[in-house]
Amino acid sequence: MGDAVLVAIANVLAANLRDGDVLARWGGEEFLALMPYCPLEAACATAERIRAAIAQAPLDVGQAPIALTMSFGVTQVRSTEDLHTAIARADKALYQSKNAGRDQVSVA
């Protein structure tokens, strides 16, 4: 069932990203979306739209529908940093969301 949930989530994520955005599984239950040339405000709005879509529609993965929540960490790569540093900041923001009760978007 776990793989079916990941596939269902990935489908919601992909449906809300733009052509040219990159979606990857990052760790066990995390995803990473790279959104080139996307202003921070638009990236936050996309994360919020995905969060709401997951929260409002229980996923049907073959058994009883499963209610899920998603937490997000959003950041923008600064001109003075590499991608790894930006990802680390997004990860910190993700854990801010999780520690603040989950099911929210935090910005780094």
Residue ranges of predicted features:
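Active-site-proximal alpha-helical element of nucleotidyl cyclase-like catalytic domains
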Residues: M1-V22, E30, P36, I54
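A short glycine-centered flexible hinge/capping loop motif at secondary-structure junctions
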Residues: G2, G27-G28, G62-Q63, G101-R102
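Alpha-helical scaffold within the catalytic cores of cyclic-nucleotide enzymes
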Residues: A10-N11, A42-P58, R89
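Short catalytic/binding micro-motifs of nucleotide second-messenger systems
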Residues: A15-G20, A52-A64, L94-Q96
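A short pre-motif secondary-structure segment
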Residues: V22-R25, I66
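Residue-level recognition of strand-loop junctions within catalytic nucleotide-signaling folds
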Residues: M35-P39, A55, V77-R78
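Catalytic-core segments of nucleotide cyclases and related cyclic-nucleotide turnover enzymes
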Residues: C44, G62, Q76-S106
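PAS and PAS-like sensory/regulatory domains
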Residues: L68-M70
